[in-house]
Amino acid sequence: MEIKVLGPGCANCKRLYQEAERAVAQSGVPATITKVEAIEEIASYGILRTPGLVIDGKVVASGRIPLTPEIATMITTAAAAKV
Protein backbone atom coordinates (compact mmCIF):
# COMPACT_ATOMS: atom_id res chain seq x y z
CA MET A 1 0.00 0.00 0.00
CA GLU A 2 1.22 3.47 -0.84
CA ILE A 3 0.31 6.46 1.32
CA LYS A 4 1.22 10.02 0.41
CA VAL A 5 1.06 13.10 2.60
CA LEU A 6 0.67 16.16 0.38
CA GLY A 7 1.82 19.57 1.54
CA PRO A 8 4.63 22.11 1.49
CA GLY A 9 6.21 20.91 4.74
CA CYS A 10 4.13 23.04 7.10
CA ALA A 11 3.45 22.07 10.72
CA ASN A 12 0.07 20.54 9.81
CA CYS A 13 1.70 18.46 7.07
CA LYS A 14 4.28 17.13 9.52
CA ARG A 15 1.55 16.31 12.03
CA LEU A 16 -0.45 14.43 9.39
CA TYR A 17 2.67 12.44 8.48
CA GLN A 18 3.07 11.44 12.15
CA GLU A 19 -0.61 10.47 12.40
CA ALA A 20 -0.22 8.36 9.23
CA GLU A 21 2.85 6.60 10.67
CA ARG A 22 0.92 5.72 13.83
CA ALA A 23 -2.08 4.57 11.78
CA VAL A 24 0.06 2.22 9.68
CA ALA A 25 1.52 0.71 12.85
CA GLN A 26 -1.94 0.42 14.42
CA SER A 27 -3.55 -1.15 11.34
CA GLY A 28 -0.82 -3.74 10.79
CA VAL A 29 -1.13 -3.24 7.01
CA PRO A 30 2.24 -3.04 5.22
CA ALA A 31 2.55 0.43 3.69
CA THR A 32 5.06 3.02 2.59
CA ILE A 33 4.50 6.65 3.48
CA THR A 34 5.88 9.39 1.27
CA LYS A 35 5.94 13.16 1.75
CA VAL A 36 5.02 15.05 -1.42
CA GLU A 37 6.09 18.69 -1.28
CA ALA A 38 6.26 19.53 -5.00
CA ILE A 39 3.43 21.95 -5.79
CA GLU A 40 2.97 20.48 -9.28
CA GLU A 41 2.44 16.96 -7.91
CA ILE A 42 0.12 18.20 -5.16
CA ALA A 43 -1.92 20.06 -7.79
CA SER A 44 -2.13 16.91 -9.93
CA TYR A 45 -4.30 15.36 -7.18
CA GLY A 46 -6.73 18.29 -7.27
CA ILE A 47 -5.86 19.31 -3.71
CA LEU A 48 -6.85 22.91 -3.05
CA ARG A 49 -6.02 22.95 0.67
CA THR A 50 -3.18 21.15 2.39
CA PRO A 51 -2.44 18.88 4.02
CA GLY A 52 -3.76 16.12 1.83
CA LEU A 53 -3.76 12.37 2.36
CA VAL A 54 -3.68 9.92 -0.54
CA ILE A 55 -4.04 6.15 -0.16
CA ASP A 56 -3.24 4.04 -3.21
CA GLY A 57 -3.76 6.98 -5.56
CA LYS A 58 -7.08 8.10 -4.06
CA VAL A 59 -7.45 11.38 -2.13
CA VAL A 60 -9.06 10.49 1.20
CA ALA A 61 -8.59 13.78 3.08
CA SER A 62 -7.79 17.38 2.21
CA GLY A 63 -7.46 20.55 4.25
CA ARG A 64 -7.66 18.75 7.60
CA ILE A 65 -5.73 16.38 9.82
CA PRO A 66 -7.58 13.11 10.39
CA LEU A 67 -6.52 11.45 13.63
CA THR A 68 -4.79 8.07 13.87
CA PRO A 69 -7.94 5.92 14.35
CA GLU A 70 -9.65 7.48 11.32
CA ILE A 71 -6.57 6.99 9.12
CA ALA A 72 -6.21 3.40 10.36
CA THR A 73 -9.81 2.76 9.28
CA MET A 74 -9.09 4.30 5.87
CA ILE A 75 -6.06 2.01 5.52
CA THR A 76 -7.88 -1.18 6.48
CA THR A 77 -10.81 -0.27 4.21
CA ALA A 78 -8.44 0.31 1.27
CA ALA A 79 -6.62 -2.95 2.02
CA ALA A 80 -9.90 -4.90 2.15
CA ALA A 81 -10.96 -3.41 -1.20
CA LYS A 82 -7.82 -4.85 -2.80
CA VAL A 83 -8.66 -8.42 -1.82
Indicate where each model-derived feature is located.
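Residue-level recognition of oxygen-bearing side chains
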Residues: 15, 41, 70
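Short, ordered loop/turn segments at secondary-structure junctions
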Residues: 8, 38, 58
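Local sequence-structure signature of Cys/Sec-based thiol-disulfide redox active-site neighborhoods
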Residues: 1-19
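Non-catalytic, surface beta->alpha helical segment in thiol-disulfide oxidoreductase systems
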Residues: 55-82
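Structural micro-motif
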Residues: 46-54
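Conserved helix-turn-beta segment immediately C-terminal to the redox Cys motif
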Residues: 17-32
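Thiol-based oxidoreductase modules, predominantly thioredoxin-like and allied folds used
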Residues: 30-41
